Amino acid sequence: FIDKGEECAYFSKSTGLCIEVSTSLFSHESKAYGHLNKLFEDVFEKSIKINIDKIDILTLSHEQHLIYIVFHNMKHFLTGGFGIRQVADFSKYIETYGEYINWEKFWSDLKDLNYDTFALNLIEISLKYLGFNDDKITYPDNITSFDELKNSQKYYINSESLINDILDAGVFGASTMDRKHTALMTLDAVEDKKKSNRLKA
């Protein structure tokens, strides 16, 4: 058993199984993404029950789960990158649970934190490269077609640089020492920007 503050991990030496449990979704100390926990303060009130192997468990609501996937990808993007598997997790979650998601709430929550454009670029990558079916999505302003949304030019949707970064990153951005070093500078810049924005307010 390993206790790392906001994360606890169990590691079995005989099987190699590792189970991590986080006591918060994001580190409260992080200036870059600690504020994202605010969106999950009502997580227990909004939790849903699912049944796995005849056992009921509580989990995030479908909107909060998808928002968490977006935030988690951004967290890894800031700390070195994330792989195509994480984009597949995002698109597969939508394909599986999209009909249960309150899309208006989803987009509103993302827009409040300026993550809506990032999510739209993940959708574009999913459509272009992963055979993603977006028929369960209602886009912002009740738009039902991705092409219509992109042509409206209300959002910066140009996923070419992002997909190149994803493919270069490896699983979690640790493909090279240069990436790890650059990630530290990026995270530092984001934290400084958050600090200066708070000082202006």
Task: Enumerate the predicted regions with their spans.
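Conserved NTP-donor binding/palm subdomain of two-metal-ion nucleotidyltransferases/polymerases, i.e.
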Residues: 1-201
